[in-house]
Amino acid sequence: MPHFHYSLTDEQAAELVFKKYGVRITPEQIAKAYAPEQRMSWKKSVEVARFIKGMTLKQAKAWLEDVVKLKRPIPIKTFKKKQAHHATPWEGWPVAKWPVKVAKRYLQLLENLENNAKFKGLDVERLVIIHAAAHKGIKIPNIMPRAFGRATPFNEETVNVEIVAAELPKEVVPKRYKLNLVKR
């Protein structure tokens, strides 16, 4: 079985929880999931990872299921050049999208995270996503034949996705996810 290198160690995750929530946890209260070399958009993966960070596991799964059903979008904060900006669209974001393929892959990863947490004996209702990251993976080389015997490189990008969740005490677990609305 390959050994994956997470960008966050258990000690760093415990320190991150203490800084944000003021609670000391042990490495046994941390669950991780990693999906290497996923064939999906890196930019959309970064936006989804940024959005689900801070949610409980149940909240993130519910939101991403709504994205797959095209009911609720994901806000786009970084990669928004040449995208449609709306006056007051979905709950105050000027740019939002429905990255269905990315949401399906993240749902599979969240399912993996939930199973890892159950295996460690953690309470799934109290799991909060404290770290989510998407890193560029390898490029799968490909070529597109062109006219007059030419060829153009047509590479496929891959993404390495990691999610870290921590089991927090009930009084610290966020009841409802607060959305960061854009002030105009």
Curated annotation (Swiss-Prot):
| UniProt-listed InterPro entries | Ribosomal_uL22 (IPR001063), Ribosomal_uL22_euk/arc (IPR005721), Ribosomal_uL22_sf (IPR036394)
Task: Give one GO term, molecular function aspect.
Answer: structural constituent of ribosome
**One cellular component term from this protein's GO annotations in UniProt:** cytosolic large ribosomal subunit
**Alphabetically ordered keywords of this record:** Ribonucleoprotein, Ribosomal protein, RNA-binding, rRNA-binding
Gene Ontology BP term (one): cytoplasmic translation
- Lineage: superkingdom: Archaea
Cystine crosslinks: none
Similarity annotation: Belongs to the universal ribosomal protein uL22 family.
Subunit architecture: Part of the 50S ribosomal subunit.
Briefly state the protein's biological role: This protein binds specifically to 23S rRNA. It makes multiple contacts with different domains of the 23S rRNA in the assembled 50S subunit and ribosome.
What is this protein's record name?
A: Large ribosomal subunit protein uL22
Organism in which the protein naturally occurs: Pyrobaculum calidifontis (strain DSM 21063 / JCM 11548 / VA1)
